[in-house]
Design a protein with these regions (language model features):
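Conserved class I S-adenosyl-L-methionine
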Residues: 79-89
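Class I SAM-dependent methyltransferase Rossmann-like catalytic core
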Residues: 46-70
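C-terminal lobe and adjacent flexible extensions of AdoMet/dcAdoMet transferase-like proteins
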Residues: 240-244, 248-321
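Conserved beta-strand signature within the Rossmann-like core of class I S-adenosyl-L-methionine
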Residues: 176-185
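N-terminal auxiliary segments of SAM/dcSAM-dependent transferases
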Residues: 1-42
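Conserved SAM/SAH-binding beta-strand->alpha-helix loop
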Residues: 113
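A short SAM/SAH-binding and catalytic strip from SAM-dependent methyltransferases
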Residues: 148-162
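Conserved SAM-binding loop of SAM-dependent methyltransferases across substrates and taxa
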Residues: 90-103
Length: 321
């Protein structure tokens, strides 16, 4: 394998080879059942025999993009040498970690699903990283499992609140530098992120992102903090979902906590910016609450910079009103 090939590209090739071994109608039936179960929040319902392959086809690309986006927030990626993936599934977060941290030496993946663990071995074998696998329920682990970065990606929603709090505390204990939490970008998903935020701030954690402060979250009621990645659908993805649109948007909420104090931006864009004739309008999360910023041409460089703003970007300029 060439040194230039990304971990994702290698994993995607392996997934395509697995999918090619099964008829499309059977995979489509499995994908539809998977989607129905997730919409109904029935994560543990009886599964189609091709559930694991359907998950790879339907969910792996989007959850990879989210994990890669979130892990890329961590500074000095060359200093990260170990990674713990709790509730690893097929190893999506671990593949993203391989593409994010160039000097990764060791990874530990823990999941209760033996078939997913077999798949993750295949998807991750493109690197010389030492791989450790453990099969078990993540909320009943004995530990310890120390690692520079501990990741829980789309995991908390499968546990009750008591088990969530206990696992978050364990994960924070094992994290040597950072703890990464990702949940669906829904009110329920963000609710889990918010509870983890409150729990670990009380333990002395520092927020790396997305929050630009340690104050209470200013988003209340029907508003919640979430972001989005747009990914291009591959041909097999479109065929399985029966759609023609060439892309999809994956909404997510996240939190990265640090063991060390970090420098925050002044603000973060929390809603898609609007570009109007002669004006740029965007909403910011700040230490003083949510602020709507309006920039015009008279704001010069700040106005030009605002034209390129995206949801989730940091903002440090005081220009505008």
């Amino acid at each position: 394998m060439s040194a230039e090939t990304s971990a994702f590209a290698y994993a995607n090739t392996q997934i395509l080879q697995m999918l090619d071994q099964h008829p499309l109608p059977e995979l489509k039936a499995a994908a539809e059942e998977l989607s129905q179960n997730y919409r109904a929040l029935e994560f543990h319902k009886s599964r189609h025999p091709l559930f694991h392959l359907a998950y790879l086809a339907v969910r792996f690309p989007a959850t990879f993009d989210v994990n890669h986006k979130v892990l890329s927030v961590i500074p000095n990626p060359q200093d990260i040498t170990s990674f713990l993936d709790l509730g690893a599934g097929p190893g999506t977060a671990s593949v993203a970690a391989q593409d994010t941290f160039s000097d990764l030496k060791e990874m530990t993946l823990i999941d209760s699903d033996g078939q997913f663990q077999k798949i993750s071995r295949t998807l991750l074998e493109s690197r010389k990283t030492k791989l450790n696998f453990e099969q078990g329920l993540i909320h009943r682990l004995k530990g310890p499992y120390p690692a520079d970065v501990v990741s829980m990606s789309y995991v908390l929603g499968e546990l009750d609140e008591g088990a969530q709090a206990a696992l978050i505390q364990e994960a924070w204990t094992w994290a040597q530098k950072y703890l990464s939490l990702i949940e669906p970008g829904t009110p329920r998903g963000y609710g889990r992120i918010l509870r983890a935020r409150e729990q670990l701030l009380a333990k002395g954690a520092y927020i790396l992102g997305p929050c630009p402060h340690h104050n209470g979250c200013p988003l209340t009621g029907n508003d919640w903090c979430h972001f989005s990645v747009r990914l291009q659908r591959q041909e097999y993805h479109r065929r399985l979902k029966g759609v023609s649109l060439g892309y999809e948007d994956e909404k997510y909420s996240y939190l990265i906590l640090s063991k060390e104090s970090v420098t925050h931006p002044k603000a973060r864009v929390i809603r898609p910016p609007r570009s109007l004739p002669g004006r740029q309008i965007f909403d910011l999360c700040t230490s003083n609450g949510v602020l709507r910023k309006t920039l015009t041409k008279k704001d010069g460089p700040a106005f030009k910079a605002a034209k390129h703003l995206r949801l989730g970007d940091a903002w440090d300029d005081d220009s505008g009103s």
